[in-house]
Structures are given as C-alpha cells and as structure tokens.
Amino acid sequence: MAVRVPLGCTGSFCPRLLPLLALLELLVDPSLGRVHHLALKDDVRHKVHLNTFGFFKDGYMVVNISSLSVNEPEGVKDKDTEIGFSLDRTKNDGFSSYLDEDVNYCILKKKSMSSVTLLILDISGSGVKVRSPPEAGKQLPEIVFSKDEKVPSRSQEPAVSSNPKDSKVQRTPDGSKAQRSTVDSKTIAEKFFSIHKNDGAVSFQFFFNISTSDQEGLYSLYFHKCPSSKLRSGEQVSFSLNIDITEKNPDSYLSAGEIPLPKLYVSMALLFFLSGTVWIHILRKRRNDVFKIHWLMAALPFTKSLSLVFHAIDYHYISSQGFPIEGWAVVYYITHLLKGALLFITIALIGTGWAFIKHILSDKDKKIFMIVIPLQVLANVAYIIIESTEEGTTEYGLWKDSLFLVDLLCCGAILFPVVWSIRHLQEASATDGKAAINLAKLKLFRHYYVLIVCYIYFTRIIAFLLKFAVPFQWKWLYQLLDETATLVFFVLTGYKFRPASDNPYLQLSQEEDDLEMESVVTTSGVMENMKKVKKVSNGAVEPQGSWEGTA
C-alpha cells in the first residue's frame, strides 16, 4: 500500500481544494485493479457481471469464492432456486447474444449453450456441476477445481475431478485431440465437483489456463440467480457473495486490449506538450494581438499532457502488480478533472466571443456556464467512481449510465453559445453596414460549429462503436482514435482563432470598438464638428484613433 505523505499549503486556495482531495481519497481504493475483490451483501439481482478480461495464450484466471450463501423465504427449498456462474467467450466487446434475453430468462436452465461454460451450484449437496460445451478443451479452456491456493503455473495440468467417474477428460496442452469422456464429444459434458460448506455458506476455488491460440479471446464471468416459481408476490431471494478474482496475461495484469495503453498515453502526452509549446511560441510572437482567452487555450494542452502522463503511470503499475498506486491514481484523477472542466469552459468561452468581442458575458451566457460547469464536475466524479469501483457492485451501473447522460448534456450545452452567435451574426449582417466583416465571422463560426460537432461525433460515437467492433486485442484503437481526435480538435481550434491581424475574429473586435466610440462622440455637442482619423501601422488598424477639428 502506498504511504501517504502529508502536504502543507498556505493561502485561501488550498482550503478550497481540501474537500476535493478528501473526496478523491475516499473514491480511490488501492486494492482495486486487475486483482479484484468484490463483497456483496443481501443482493437481490438476478444477474451480476463480475468481470471481463481479454486473454492471450498462457494467460490465466483464478477465482476464489470465500463465501457464498443464499437467503430464501420460508417454504422455499434450496433446490428450488438455482444459482451459479457462467463463463462466456467472445472475439470482441460486443454484447453476448444469450444475455440479451428478458428478465425472466435464466441461462442456468439451458441444456445447450455454445461458447458458454456453466457452473451450477448445489448448496444442499455441497457440490457444483460444471456444464461445458462440446468445444471445451479445444476452443474453450477447461474449468479446473483445486484446493490449492497457489496461482497456477502456465504448464500446470488441470486438477483431477473429485468424482472418479467424471475424471476421464484431460486437457492436452499440445492441442491434440482430447480423450473421450463418459458423454459424447458432440454433446454437453457435465462434471460434478465437491465443495466446502460451513454454516450454510459454500466456498471453493477454480481456475483456467489459456493453453492454445484458439482459446484466446474476451472472457466474461457472470453470477446468476434463478428464483423459484414457488415464490409469492413480493418475496425475493437474496444472496451474499465474497469473491476474489485474479487474471493475468503472460507479461501483464492488463487485459489484451489494454497492454499498449501506457506507451500510447506517453506518446500522445508528448504530442500535446509539443502543440502547447508551439502555441506559446505563437503567443509570444504576436503579443499585440493576444487576448486572455488565448492564454486559457494555452493551458489546455499542457493540462491534457499531464493527465495522460499520470494515466500512463497509473496503468504501468496496474500492469506490473495488478493494482494502482494510490498517490498516482489521485494525481491522475485531479488532472483529469481539471482538464475536463477547462476544455468545456474554453469551448464555451470561444463560442460566446468572450475577450475577443466582449468583456462581459450576457445573462444567457452565464446560464450556460452555470449548467456546463456543474455537469462537467459531475461527469468527472462519475468517471472516477467507475474507474475505482468493481463492475459487480450495484452502484457501478448507475454511475456508468449517469456518466453517459451527463456527458451528452454537456456536449449539447456547449453548442448553444455558438448557435446564438451564428444567429446574431446573421441578423447583424442584414442590418448594419459591415456585412462583409460579419459574413466573414459568420463563416468562421459555422466552421467552429462543424468542428465541435465532428469532435463530439468522433470521440463519443465513432470511438464508442469502434470499441465494440474491433477484435479484443485491438481495443486500444478506441483510445487512439479518441486522443487523436482531441489533438486534431485542439490544433484546428488554435489555427482558426490564432492571434493574427488578418483574423476576421479579431478584426471585428477592433471595428466594433471604433463603432462604439463614434456613437459616443456624435452624441456630444462639444465634439460636434470633429471627425475621426484612424492611425495605420504595418497595415493593421489600431483600436485607438486621434481626433482633429474641422472648423
């Protein structure tokens, strides 16, 4: 466990950060990672998704159920309620067909199921029945029960069944044809193993090895509870489960599709840092045309770069030891939260034209920020909870759905300032005498609107679909597309709103300042016979002008 080092700080800013740091300390559990521990108490769900992991050859999974008990209403026997586990194998992260059934569907009652191994518990009989499909041992690994608590080695053979007449099937590591058991190879093979029972709770351990390349894939482990039909209305069967899951590939605790992520994050962090450095050089070179929003834009790539570096470090420790280091995880979550909030604030400020054409936000603009900022903080908190919570917990699904909804609302909200600016420019180009400048800025805003829509489309929709379409070992392409789209969005936004005298976005600011000054002067009787003379230097119109008398 990581040792916490007390940090000291002074000033009024640090006390404001203390509640956030305390929240992050509570959310981050150093024991979580690819070595999983899940404890459920009096749970009433029919199906619990315990974990999903992509395995290469020589990978393995060890599942240790230290306690599993069922609490049934009076009059219902143990055999009336079926409980057990299922191990599903797919080639990608798509949805399993057998899990898309209605609520009353119970996979444990199915006699034949392709690519799914079932473990059906008999608590009263202190045993578990393993129902394997015909391809078990060839395209699917065999489930091995063992009383040994040690992690199995790659060359370890499956343990012999506790039932002698079921011990005829042995796995062949060289991929040769397995021996025929008491059941035909084209039918479902069933084996029975004895398990330990104490005070109504059972405990046992099983594991499997990926011995051939044909067995590689994305494996999902589920817990199922099939209530009895004898239950009366309002009655429920609850269960308590304490389980530890260890899963590992040959050289990493990361899933097959996550192994390249540390290197990917470091590479993208370098690109974001270089883009930020180039942007700082442009700002220093064009100091006379720089606004406050340009410096806010400069902070964004550096914050993103830091977030990616800490994310890479976090994944490095998970890869090497199976769980993150608490300190690095907290630092990553802080930078991720700041990056997310800064990104949406910057996009909204550019859309409203703050610091470019106006220095005070309108009431409509303020309402947008009052909506976007809390939603973005909530989205980042949901992300942190999801990252530091096991999939099988009841709150995991709730926070995952909340993150999707809140992120969608944020993406929709930041489009409103751009739409309002486009509508305002359309009206202004038809009324005032500066139609050319307004039309140029209108074209720029339309490009920015399309840019935001494309960014949302690629990072929220295309990348999401890619994650479910590509094979399990290429799942990291989802993150590559997401980070690449973000980098392209940063570069194009900087190019569109770069500090330059020929930028229509900045020219409008200077022309409107002149227009406001003319309206003030013409309403003054003292300056009635004065006309404005603009000073021109280096081909650019300066915002301030001098006045001379005409009398």
From Swiss-Prot:
Signal sequence interval, chain numbering: 1-33
Bilayer disposition of the protein: Multi-pass membrane protein
Regions crossing the membrane: 263-283, 293-313, 337-357, 368-388, 402-422, 444-466, 476-495
GO biological process, one term: clathrin-dependent endocytosis
Stretches of the chain found on the membrane's Cytoplasmic side: 284-292, 358-367, 423-443, 496-551
GO annotation, cellular component aspect: clathrin-coated vesicle; early endosome; Golgi apparatus; membrane; nucleoplasm; plasma membrane
Tissue/organ expression: Widely expressed. Not detected in the duodenum, nor in the exocrine pancreas.
The record's account of how the chain is modified after translation: Cleaved by FURIN to yield two fragments that remain associated via a disulfide bond.
Region Disordered, residue ranges: 127-183
Annotated glycan sites: N64, N209
Subcellular localization: Cell membrane; Golgi apparatus, trans-Golgi network membrane
GO molecular function, one term: clathrin heavy chain binding
Polar residues: compositionally biased ranges: 153-164
PANTHER family with a match to the protein in the record: LUNG SEVEN TRANSMEMBRANE RECEPTOR (PTHR21229), PROTEIN GPR107 (PTHR21229:SF12)
Function: Has been proposed to act as a receptor for neuronostatin, a peptide derived from the somatostatin/SST precursor. Involved in blood sugar regulation through the induction of glucagon in response to low glucose.
Family: Belongs to the LU7TM family.
Protein name per its UniProtKB record: Protein GPR107
Protein's organism: Rattus norvegicus (Rat)
Gene designation: Gpr107
